Swiss-Prot record:
Residues 189-209, 241-421 are annotated as: Disordered. Self-associates. Interacts with HIC2. Interacts with CTBP1 and CTBP2. Interacts with TCF7L2 and ARID1A. Interacts with MTA1 and MBD3; indicative for an association with the NuRD complex. Interacts with SIRT1. Residues 344-361 have a biased composition (Basic and acidic residues). The modification N6-acetyllysine is found at K333. This is Hypermethylated in cancer 1 protein. The modification Omega-N-methylarginine is found at R159. It comes from the Eukaryota. Residues 192-206, 284-293, 368-380 have a biased composition (Pro residues). A zinc finger (C2H2-type) spans 439-459, 509-529, 537-557, 565-585, 593-613. GO terms for molecular function: DNA-binding transcription factor activity; DNA-binding transcription factor activity, RNA polymerase II-specific; DNA-binding transcription repressor activity, RNA polymerase II-specific; histone deacetylase binding; sequence-specific DNA binding; sequence-specific double-stranded DNA binding; zinc ion binding.
Length: 733
């Protein structure tokens, strides 16, 4: 007797148990998977992509990066070598970002580690990680950084209010000339009038001291003229984040107008209510922090530099700087290509080729330069003519190699080490951490990319100074009426157009119309044209005109192998290596030995095989020459002479018989042919070339195939070798 209800319950219980088995999962499986991937990354195992951040290299896996970052996902599809914008992310910050991608956590010491990449003791350094996460489009890391900033009371999101609520224009992103950059410590010094304001005893807290963000940009705010207003009521322009201007102390008459308060032209897509007042940025300031060991800038910035906040007044900078300046974080960087400081300085200095033209040619004195025959003053310590010339000889030699790129102009004073670029307007710490930025030619390390760029620019200036002195010496020799250094005079007379110049400077530049007296000076000049190549190799400094050429060049440094075999998975650095490898799977052997007929898949295998013939041929030639010198022959049982040849000579005879169809007719011609060819076999290095040229010498002697008789059939007078091969008299048939 059965009960249907019991059957139904039993079946339902079985289904429920099966469902539980199907839905069971191993706890912590994803965590263990990430842990294994991170271990593989640290060991470089199965890493298929390299990320270059300035001079630092990071190996990773494409799948992990593509699953974590939308920005990196778009890059790893097309290339195995990624170059990130060093203005957006620094090596130390990217190391934290990469650790978060592989571990899912931002360590408690991450803030301090990120601060070490900017300056020791800088408290709001977590903003650098937030800026990098926004740039790389990693939403989980962005949310984590915002949460931590809110917990510390340093984050406040600005909300634009409508109807006079005090917002900013609805821009989706800032203008092209302004980019979010990795935060750096910036000291805003006061104007020349009055002493600097004393630092506050206690940093204020609250929304006034928060770090504001909008559209993935970071803005540091603080107490100022608008401190009484709420953060959402301040009319903060998204185009101008942090006020970098110099502020006069309270009570000074006619304070300077800050950079952030200058009116910007209205945009066509802005609403009518967004008038000029909506584009003004109130002066902001962060609470003062403990003083840091800043380097003192050795030369004041130009008064027209907008990044130092000057209004263009001719007042000079005070020579003394306070030991504990108030610090601000600069979140926006101006591109030199959009005018202002970079263009003005470029117009004052001119391009390197223009400066070379001023110093070169037949001009006796360059405009505004030193007198004829005098070298320009050194731009940095340890130049060619400086006091340390003896100790910097190695630096000069290394400068003949390819130098790295320098996006920014060199400092006005030309300081080599410890001098930040003038338009950055902040003092670098004297030393923090390891020197991550290394100059490839000379091997010197620097703690920041700006100091490295200034150092590389100094290399270029050194080469240009050498070129200018060589040009001045040549022009002086021509003006003094000296003849050419060689006595003949050449094909052209001195009075002919360009005749004297070509006699004095026979080496002409392929990129311009300048010529030089020796190749070394020409090479120094040709390096000035490299400044027009926008893609430098971050490993060796060599520059390229196309990005793809630079990427292929860097594969040789980094050991990348982008060409994979579909059959076995082996990877190669070059396409032709993969083509050679595929012959192993296909069985193709295109390289054939012309001596013995052996076939090979690789050309290098054929070369090794031919060397074996060459060694044997040299030994056989020695025995043949000894036999021709009068050594007794070795008669056979039938009275005929026997030929004792090593294996190499036998192969030569076989080749000669097969391709020339030799017959025993003209012994004199054969003897002459043998005399013409055997001298090649004395040296084993050239023996390879002597295996096939028998046909060539036969044609040169005018011998037809019927007359090229018995090249090696004179065996009655040949001596037997110890390892020879004895055969009957050779016949082509």
């Amino acid at each position: 007797m059965t009960f249907p209800e019991a059957d139904i319950l039993l079946k339902s219980g079985e289904c429920a148990g099966q469902t539980m088995l199907d839905t069971m999962e191993a706890p912590g499986h994803s965590r263990q998977l990430l842990l294994q991937l991170n271990n593989q990354r640290t060991k470089g195992f199965l890493c298929d992509v390299i990320i270059v951040v300035q001079n630092a290299l990071f190996r990773a896996h494409k799948n992990v990066l593509a699953a974590s970052s939308a920005y990196l996902k778009s890059l790893v599809v097309h290339d195995n070598l990624l170059n990130l914008d060093h203005d957006m992310v620094s090596p130390a910050v990217f190391r934290l970002v990469l650790d978060f991608i592989y571990t899912g956590r931002l360590a408690d010491g991450a803030e301090a580690a990120a601060a070490a990449a900017v300056a020791p003791g800088a408290e709001p350094s977590l903003g650098a990680v937030l800026a990098a996460a926004s740039y790389l489009q990693i939403p989980d890391l962005v949310a984590l950084c915002k949460k931590r900033l809110k917990r510390h009371g340093k984050y406040c999101h600005l909300r634009g209010g409508g109807g006079g609520g005090g917002g900013y224009a609805p821009y989706g992103r800032p203008g092209r000339g302004l980019r979010a950059a990795t935060p750096v410590i910036q000291a805003c010094y006061p104007s020349p009038v009055g002493p600097p304001p004393p630092p506050a005893a206690e940093p204020p807290s609250g929304p006034e001291a928060a770090v504001n963000t909008h559209c993935a940009e970071l803005y540091a705010s603080g107490p100022g003229p608008a401190a009484a207003l709420c953060a959402s009521e301040r009319r903060c322009s998204p185009l101008c984040g942090l006020d970098l201007s110099k502020k006069s102390p309270p009570g000074s008459a006619a304070p300077e107008r800050p950079l952030a308060e200058r009116e910007l032209p209205p945009r066509p897509d802005s609403p009518p209510s967004a008038g000029p007042a909506a584009y003004k940025e109130p002066p902001l300031a962060l609470p003062s922090l403990p003083p840091l060991p800043f380097q003192k800038l050795e030369e004041a910035a130009p008064p027209s530099d907008p990044f130092r906040g000057g209004s263009g007044s001719p007042g000079p900078e005070p020579p003394g700087r306070p030991d504990g300046p108030s610090l601000l974080y600069r979140w926006m960087k101006h591109e030199p290509g959009l005018g202002s400081y970079g263009d003005e300085l470029g117009r004052e200095r001119g391009s390197p080729s223009e400066r070379c033209e001023e110093r070169g040619g037949d001009a006796a004195v360059s405009p505004g330069g030193p007198p004829l025959g005098l070298a320009p003053p050194p731009r940095y310590p340890g130049s060619l003519d400086g006091p340390g010339a003896g100790g910097d000889g190695d630096d000069y030699k290394s400068s003949s190699e390819e130098t790295g790129s320098s996006e920014d102009p060199s400092p006005p004073g030309g300081h080599l080490e410890g001098y930040p670029c003038p338009h950055l307007a902040y003092g670098e710490p004297e030393s923090f951490g390891d020197n991550l930025y290394v100059c490839i030619p000379c091997g010197k390390g620097f703690p920041s990319s700006e100091q490295l760029n200034a150092h590389v620019e100094a290399h270029v200036e050194e080469e240009e100074a050498l070129y200018g002195r060589a040009e001045a010496a040549e022009v002086a020799a021509g003006a003094a009426g000296l003849g050419p250094p060689f006595g003949g005079g050449g094909d052209k007379v001195a009075g002919a157009p360009g005749g004297l110049g070509e006699l004095l400077r026979p080496y002409r530049c392929a990129s311009c119309d300048k010529s030089y007296k020796d190749p070394a000076t020409l090479r120094q000049h040709e390096k000035t044209h490299w400044l027009t190549r926008p893609y430098p190799c971050t490993i060796c400094g060599k520059k390229f005109t196309q990005r793809g050429t630079m990427t292929r060049h860097m594969r040789s440094h980094l050991g990348l192998k982008p060409f994979a075999c579909d059959a076995c998975g082996m990877r190669f650095t070059r396409q032709y290596r993969l083509t050679e490898h595929m012959r192993i799977h296909s069985g193709e052997k295109p390289y054939e030995c012309q001596v013995c007929g052996g076939k090979f898949a690789q050309q290098r295998n054929l070369i090794s095989h031919m060397k074996m013939h060459a060694v044997g041929g040299a030994a056989g030639a020695a025995g043949a020459l000894a036999g021709l010198g009068g050594l007794p022959g070795v008669p056979g049982p039938d009275g005929k002479g026997k030929l004792d040849f090593p294996e190499g000579v036998f192969a030569v005879a076989r080749l000669t018989a097969e391709q020339l169809s030799l017959k025993q007719q003209d012994k004199a011609a054969a003897a002459e042919l043998l005399a013409q060819t055997t001298h090649f076999l004395h040296d084993p290095k050239v023996a390879l070339e002597s295996l096939y040229p028998l046909a060539k010498f036969t044609a040169e002697l005018g011998l037809s195939p019927d007359k090229a008789a018995e090249v090696l059939s004179q065996g009655a007078h040949l001596a037997a070798g110890p390892d020879g091969r004895t055969i009957d008299r050779f016949s082509p048939t």
